Each structure stands twice: as structure tokens, then as C-alpha cells.
Swiss-Prot record:
Residues 1-39 form the signal peptide. It comes from Mycobacterium tuberculosis (strain ATCC 25618 / H37Rv). GO terms for molecular function: extracellular matrix binding. Residues 61-74, 88-103, 287-305 have a biased composition (Pro residues). This is Alanine and proline-rich secreted protein Apa. Pfam families: FAP. Glycans are attached at T49, T57, T66, T316. GO terms for biological process: cellular response to starvation.
Length: 325
């Protein structure tokens, strides 16, 4: 008989116990691992691999830009409107717009002065005032150029002493009235007035002639300068204009309706030719106001009553006194 080694039995028992313990531990680990895995976060999605995808022929769309608010469309533009042509005609005016103000050609001019003595009216030039013309032998209106404001209220302003304007009717006091045409009358008037106001030796220079039109009434003007022999004197200047209609040949024609303007100046205070022309063309005949209407006829007095219808005047009987016998 074989004798069993007691140590071998004990070793086998120990090995069996160790094997049982190892199996129990393995089962515990197998059960615990799934529980621990379920508590972890979800795994990240797999990264797509571009290498495996086929190349695309279409370009990728660009990233959207930041949106910008479009400008407000013009009122007259349409969605399909083309750019405007710089050479195109301007659009027609709005038919509902108010028309521009129309200035009447015969509108009264500002600061208009009536001259009853000469029978005309005129527009006062800017910067000029009317002066006293009572001591003048020729003309009925005298204008002076102001050089400043009046020193005190109610007093006339200071005026220049080297320039003046004379206006009046071209009557028989002036030799120029005998000239049949306005151009000859203006030249004659300029020559006579030049000798009267500038009686110094000299030479006439820079002579001019200008046509005038005063609201349909024709006229003419003459201008020249005088270079005096005395070099200390500034050149004199004179502008003369005649406007109106000369006398007609008809026996029943009225007096001639012609007026004149004489503008005197110097090189230090020259004649304003444009203002002189405007002054002459502003002359208008002074129309007398219409006569006052005749008074209405008085109501007739009532007719006297017929004689048969006159009521008798009551009379009081005179008392009679009886005398004693």
C-alpha cells in the first residue's frame, strides 16, 4: 500500500482554497466593471476623416459676412432702374408746384418821385436825395449824392459837391429843344451843359452815344469827358439823355413831350453810366388825376299848391265899439 503524504494533502487543500478564492474574486471583478463603465460620460463622437471622402469640384461657400443695412431707395427709383445718364435732360417740373412769381414790366418802382412842374416822374437812384431846385434856370429836379448819414434826426445828410444830377422838361429854354431827333438833342444838350458847368479850357475825350428805351418810348444819350488844360483839375465828366417824342407837324398837336437828364461828375467821383441810363429810362409822363365827379343835381323844390286848394287864413273879427247918441 502506498502511504499518503499528509503534507501533500494539506498542500492540495491549500491549492483548492486558493483556487476557490481566485474564482470568487474574478466573479466580483466581472460584475463591478460594467457598473463602473456606465458611470463615465458619453464618449466623444468619432472625428470624421476627410482623407477617405472623395474630392469635391464645387467651391465651398464663403462664410457669411456681417449683414449691413441697405440704404433707403430713392423715391423715383425702381428695382430694375439703370444708372442715370449724366447727359439726360432734367426731369419735368412738378405740375402741382406753384408757379414762380411774375414781375410785371409796368410794376411801380420803389422810391418813385413825382415832379409836377416838369410833368414827369422818375425812380430815385440809390444813394441820392432830392435837393431844392428853385434857384435853377434849367430843369425842375436836382439830385445830390449823399456822403454819410444825417448829423441829427430831421436834418439833410451831407452831400458831395463834385457831382449832381439835373432833370426837367426839354422846353424852349434850352437850345437842344430845337433839334428834331433825340440823338441830336442829347448831343447838343451835352455840349451846352458842358460849357455851362465846366467853363475851363480843355479837350473832350472818350465820347459815347447810347440808345434809350423808357417803357416803349425811345431816346438817346451822349457822354464825354473833358481833360482840362490845368493838370491840377481832375477830368470832368458829363452824361446827357433825352427821352420822349418831339413835336408833331400837325397844327393841332400838343406841346412836345421830351425830358432830359444831365449827370455831372469828375474823375474823383465818376458818372455811373448804368445808373444814369436806368434813371433816364425810368421817366414816365405824369398823368393828371381824373377830375372829381360832378355833384349830383339837387332835388327840385316842391311845386306850390293850386290856388283853389289854398286854405283860407282864419281872421279874428275886430270888436265894434258903439258910440253914445
Amino acid at each position: 500500500m502506498h502511504q499518503v503524504d499528509p503534507n501533500l494533502t494539506r498542500r492540495k487543500g491549500r491549492l483548492a482554497a486558493l483556487a476557490i478564492a481566485a474564482m470568487a474574486s474574478a466573479s466580483l471583478v466581472t460584475v463591478a466593471v460594467p457598473a463602473t463603465a456606465n458611470a463615465d460620460p458619453e464618449p466623444a463622437p468619432p472625428v470624421p476623416t476627410t482623407a477617405a471622402s472623395p474630392p469635391s469640384t464645387a467651391a465651398a461657400p464663403p462664410a457669411p459676412a456681417t449683414p449691413v443695412a441697405p440704404p433707403p431707395p430713392a423715391a423715383a427709383n425702381t428695382p430694375n432702374a439703370q444708372p442715370g445718364d449724366p447727359n439726360a435732360a432734367p426731369p419735368p417740373a412738378d405740375p402741382n408746384a406753384p408757379p414762380p412769381p411774375v414781375i410785371a414790366p409796368n410794376a411801380p418802382q420803389p422810391v418813385r418821385i413825382d415832379n409836377p412842374v416838369g410833368g414827369f416822374s422818375f425812380a430815385l437812384p440809390a444813394g441820392w436825395v432830392e435837393s431844392d431846385a428853385a434857384h435853377f434856370d434849367y430843369g425842375s429836379a436836382l439830385l445830390s449824392k449823399t456822403t454819410g448819414d444825417p448829423p441829427f434826426p430831421g436834418q439833410p445828410p451831407p452831400v458831395a459837391n463834385d457831382t449832381r444830377i439835373v432833370l426837367g422838361r426839354l422846353d424852349q429854354k434850352l437850345y437842344a429843344s430845337a433839334e428834331a431827333t433825340d440823338s441830336k438833342a442829347a448831343a447838343r444838350l451835352g455840349s451846352d451843359m458842358g460849357e455851362f458847368y465846366m467853363p475851363y479850357p480843355g479837350t473832350r475825350i472818350n465820347q459815347e452815344t447810347v440808345s434809350l428805351d423808357a417803357n416803349g418810348v425811345s431816346g438817346s444819350a451822349s457822354y464825354y469827358e473833358v481833360k482840362f488844360s490845368d493838370p491840377s483839375k481832375p477830368n470832368g465828366q458829363i452824361w446827357t439823355g433825352v427821352i420822349g417824342s418831339p413835336a408833331a407837324n400837325a397844327p393841332d398837336a400838343g406841346p412836345p413831350q421830351r425830358w432830359f437828364v444831365v449827370w455831372l461828375g469828375t474823375a474823383n467821383n465818376p458818372v455811373d453810366k448804368g445808373a444814369a441810363k436806368a434813371l433816364a429810362e425810368s421817366i414816365r409822363p405824369l398823368v393828371a388825376p381824373p377830375p372829381a365827379p360832378a355833384p349830383a343835381p339837387a332835388e327840385p323844390a316842391p311845386a306850390p299848391a293850386p290856388a283853389g286848394e289854398v286854405a283860407p287864413t282864419p281872421t279874428t273879427p275886430t270888436p265894434q265899439r258903439t258910440l253914445p247918441a
